Amino acid sequence: MPDYDLLPLLRERLLGTYSALLADTTATLTFTAGGIATWTVDVEHGRAAARRGAPARPTTTVRAALPVLTEVVRGERPGVQAFLDGLLTVRGNLALALQLDGLFDRSHAAGGDDARTYTRAVQAGGIETFYLEAGPVDAPPVVLVHGLSATNASMLPLIPALSKQYRVLAPDLPGHGGTEAKSAAHAARYLGDWLLAFLRETTDQPAVLIGNSLGGRAALEAALNSPADVRGLVLLCPAVAFRKLRQLVPFVRVLPDEVAALPVRVPRRMAMRGLRGLFADPTRLPDAWYEAAIDEFVRVVSMRPNRLAVFSALRHVYLDEPFGESGFWDRLPTLTPPALFLWGERDVLVPAGFARWVEDALPHGRSIVLPDCGHVPQFEHPERTAELTLEFLAGL
């Protein structure tokens, strides 16, 4: 048998494994080691089996040098870290790759179980919620919440740094990634209530919420609604209520969420242009990361319930009343948990100018504008974002 054959190791690692998360899944994941060889893992009803070769259209394709693939399968190198380090690329269903990575036993690897990123699911507010977990199980909980039309994979850059000291949980929002959509009305308060339900199912102590964009708004709503459950907040370019540019409110208000049920296909080129536009300098990120993100976006919006959820969330953020008894900006001063706001100097979606309004509403909060940064600081400036986050956490 050639020494570059990964099949025996794949079979050894997958022998006897079962994933409840994959119980209803039939899929194929292909490992490709350059031009050397290809192996496929067939997933069916929670179990996985390996073989040589590749199907014509695999669900997911993982590419890396053979030594990297070998280390990942052996459990010596977390697949998430290999992806973040640019040593491994994923095309297709990224969530499937994360789930399969969790099947490889890494209990003997350096760092023990605390170095792992697990995939899990829980019922939160009646919604089957898919989430990632990393770090010591008895450490203080930190919850990462992603933005609109993304998945928990968009929070991956923060997990390695935070999971050394904290128990990190990263759920998919309802109607995103692996979390089901049960309601068409995905207003910010609804997402805040769902997030509180998730906390109560997964933790027994107050958690720090770290949210990007819509995830930041959901975190704010959770803290406003139930401050006793929230130890602190780190808001990365949070989707606050519009104070101006509300001319289209009458039209958007009568536009039903069901419009999104139409099977409209978003051209990949258009989606890519929109994604790259979120960054101050799109060249900072490898092309492989953009491709993986677009694959996830296409997968999410290809399903009707998810399209409804994404459109509903977008519509409700725009329609949010800025002022008045139920208005966001008049409720914000009642926020009591400590909060750190990070804004992107060149954010085209949530302008950094919102920082001064937040500072007026929350004199006890802290706002930092990150220079040369767009809407996704955890990807564009991961080290600085992690550094500021850890400093904030240490002060709680």
Task: Identify the role of each PLM range.
Residues 224, 233-265:
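Flexible "cap/lid" loop of the alpha/beta hydrolase fold
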Residues 127-178:
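Conserved HGGG/HGGXW glycine-rich cap/lid loop of the alpha/beta-hydrolase fold
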Residues 124, 170-210, 214, 246, ...:
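Active-site loop/oxyanion-hole signature of alpha/beta-hydrolase fold enzymes
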Residues 266-331:
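Conserved alpha/beta-hydrolase catalytic His-Asp/Glu region
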Residues 335, 341-343:
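Short beta-strand/loop motif that positions the catalytic acidic residue
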Residues 95, 99-142, 164-166, 203-205, ...:
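Alpha/beta-hydrolase fold catalytic core
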Residues 1-119:
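Feature captures hydrophobic
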Residues 322, 346-350:
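Acidic catalytic loop of the alpha/beta-hydrolase fold
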